[in-house]
Amino acid sequence: MEGSSNSNSRGFNTSGVSDRNTEFLPVERLTTRSKPSSHVDEYVRSLFGSTSTHKSGEDDSLGIDPFVRSLEWGDVSLRQWLDKPERSVDVFECLHVFRQIVEIVNAAHSQGIVVHNVRPSCFVMSSFNHVSFIESASCSDSGSDSLEDGPISQKEIGSSRREEAVSKAIAIEEKGVYNKLLERKIEKLEEEKTQPFPMKHILAMETSWYTSPEEDFGSSSTCASDVYRLGVLLFELFCPVPSREEKSRTMSSLRHRVLPPQILLKCPKEASFCLWLLHPEPTCRPSMSDLLQSEFITEPRDNLEEREAAIELRDRIEEQESLLEFLLLIQQRKQESAYRLQDTVSLLSSDIEQVVKRQLILKKRGSSLSDFSKDDHQYTSGQPLMSFQANEEPSAFLASRKRVRQGILALENGVEVDEESQGSTLLESSRLMRNFKKLESVYFLTRRRQMKAAASGKSLTRHSPLSSENGRGSMIVSEKSSVSNPVAPKAFFNNDSRQGGWIDPFLEGLCRYLSFSQLRVKADLKQGDLLNSSNLVCALAFDREGELFATAGVNKKIKIFECNSIVNDNRDIHYPVVELAGRSKLSSLCWNSYIKSQIASSNFDGVVQIWDVARSQLVTEMKEHKKRVWSIDISSADPTLLASGSDDGTVKLWSINQGVSIGTIKTKANVCCVQFPSDSGRSLAFGSADHKVYYYDLRNPKIPLCTMIGHSKTVSYVKFVDSSTLVSSSTDNTLKLWDLSMSASGINESPLHSFTGHTNLKNFVGLSVSDGYIATGSETNEVFVYHKAFPMPVMSYMFNNTDSMSGLEVDDASQFISSICWRGQSSTLVAANSNGNIKILEMMT
């Protein structure tokens, strides 16, 4: 083998791989897996510069040969990997790398080829520690020296094969790969300055390190020389050196087979094997077959297999642990949910028991009434008239409650109740069950607030959004007093059994929510100028008695109508009792609650006007605003005080008697609405185009008492529901209910409710409040009514437009409700749309 090595010796520079620099352009990988023997022989000879020729078909097969692998992004030079400062010696890893290189060299030697360039700079490692052969510039230089010893014909053949391989490599390379590798080269050059082993210096010394003793004395390279180089490589694998100077000293000592003490102590077996490979006499070095059959090579393979099996077992255990952790986490969360559910069920059971006890007390106190005399035997037996069993379905409970309620009302009125009527349930009415989830969430919200208030020693009833102001019951009645209490006198409901706790506010809210189900048209306001294109109604307002209501809009007129005459008289055209003409489009109206005939208006020119309706004349004009005034309000507690909000970013306070402003609040955005609370003239709320609601104490107008943040678009309306609760409307499609008593910090970002169901994205659609009921318009041409207790609509009504030519009702998607107003504390309201249609509506059961 050695005797024939001289003529066949080739450096890797003469293989089928072109010259490469240290940045490792595309490579060919040598291995011996799944390759037919004859093909392996010819391929290896081609790679190492054999003089044998290939058939064209075999040449073409090299591109897909399993031995060939293109350089992948992330591959690193074995030299760079060895010289990493942070590299620690992993025995299995080092032996795995060494064994791969031994197999590469053995493949060459089996064909009588001396590899010559068994040096770290001529190999690359993948991210999976897979070693592949490449050729660097240093390999070419050193290889050229060795070629001078060989015949010229062999050199020419090698050059020919190199050119052939270069053309193939260029053909298969993508332009983008070259660009990436070029960028990587630049980065490497920049990093060279900071590296402890600059590549240029290392490559210059590497050739001398890996030169065998016989080559130093002028002998040609042999297979034994490759074995010597393997010994040097094995030493570098197991003996990392931290500094450049120490590296030079260590490698110089290695020439004399002097090993550092640390490798002798830590790796005696590897050190002994290394000295065998580095023997100065070539004949005393092991052959490649001896290497491959040695325990040093074979035993690590067995150990590696055991290690891989152990790793696989560990991975499977970790997978099981991950699954176990996942299942335990699910169990923990489900247990937490079960605990919460258990607490919820316990809370519900306690509340049911409390309600049943209250029911018994109420019915015992009312046993003298004829309504309950027929059911006295139920109370004496200790059973309530209606109790909810744990195993009873909610729908069945609701059905039985409905039947009992209908039966009681029918017996009171002396009417027989048929079975079919008794069989109707709240489920069939669908409102309760359709909104069951929302009602449930409000119930739990009420309970949480009650428990929190109880913990802090506060009362829920006074400020609860579910209860009426000051704990009073509903004051709202229909025009014919259709909403009545058939059960007991008022004094009966003011007894101790209905005071405090969560039951009263939630029950009141639920009853109020279920009291009405629809809006009915009581009357249509028919005007003579219906064909006028400028009929948009911007404002509606009732006087203090609810007898007169005023309309105003873009037609620059204030029209006063008598409500009862419109409801009772079926006329083709309704004429206003008073009509006041302005000079500009009108935006807002407000009656004086103290002076019956006095009404205030604002217009698009920024003027606030006071009118005397009885004399049909203008009393006062106030012109201090610089831009359009959107909203005005006269204080009920101080009827001489008026507030106005304008596009000029100011809120002005006016003395009606003096006709001048007495105060100004400046803001950074347009003011769209203002509102006094009904019981005070010392505070004021207004909404702004900056999406916020501001609440001021007018005795300190420099800073707001509270800022309510929650809307995402312009706040178009604000109305006080009661002295401590405020509702705001925005063009973000929502109404929000705010508790002013929860704003001790000056910022309130948590509304009690967000009412959704209507559509409001760009227009002013109106807002009005009456005893807990909140009416608003929608850009779908509908009127929506909410109750402050729940976030979903109680009812809605769709306006149908009348065609001016045919008189028929038609749908017009461009129309929207533009204004709305309750008639005092009644179930009646008046609404107008953008087409000028005005309807008087009434809530019905």
From Swiss-Prot:
Primary location recorded for the protein, binned into one broad class: nucleus
Where the record places motif DWD box is: 685-699
Gene name for this UniProt entry = SPA3
Which residues lie in coiled coils? Answer: 301-329
Entry keywords, A to Z: Coiled coil, Nucleotide-binding, Nucleus, Phytochrome signaling pathway, Repeat, Transferase, Ubl conjugation pathway, WD repeat
Outline the extent of the Protein kinase domain: 1-297
Q: Which InterPro entries match?
A: G-protein_beta_WD-40_rep, Kinase-like_dom_sf, Prot_kinase_dom, SPA1/2/3/4, WD40/YVTN_repeat-like_dom_sf, WD40_repeat_CS, WD40_repeat_dom_sf, WD40_rpt
What's the stated role of this polypeptide? Repressor of photomorphogenesis in the light. Probably part of the COP1/SPA E3 ubiquitin-protein ligase complex.
Q: Which residue ranges does the record annotate as region Disordered? A: 1-33, 139-158
Q: What is known of its domains?
A: The protein kinase domain is predicted to be catalytically inactive. The DWD box is required for interaction with DDB1A.
The record's induction entry says: Up-regulated by red, far-red and blue light.
Location(s), subcellular: Nucleus
Name where the WD repeats lie: 532-571, 581-621, 624-664, 666-706, 710-748, 757-796, 812-845
Matching Pfam families: WD40 (PF00400)
Taxonomically, which superkingdom? Eukaryota
> Would I find Cytoplasm among this entry's keywords?
no
- Molecular function via GO: ATP binding; identical protein binding; protein kinase activity
What name appears for this protein in its UniProt entry?
Protein SPA1-RELATED 3
GO terms of biological process kind: photomorphogenesis; red, far-red light phototransduction
Q: Which GO terms describe its cellular component?
A: nucleus
Indicate, by first and last residue, each region the UniProt record lists as having compositional bias (Polar residues). Answer: 1-19
PROSITE patterns given in the database record: PROTEIN_KINASE_DOM (PS50011), WD_REPEATS_1 (PS00678), WD_REPEATS_2 (PS50082), WD_REPEATS_REGION (PS50294)
User: What's the source species for this entry?
Assistant: Arabidopsis thaliana
Its quaternary structure?
Interacts with COP1 and CO.
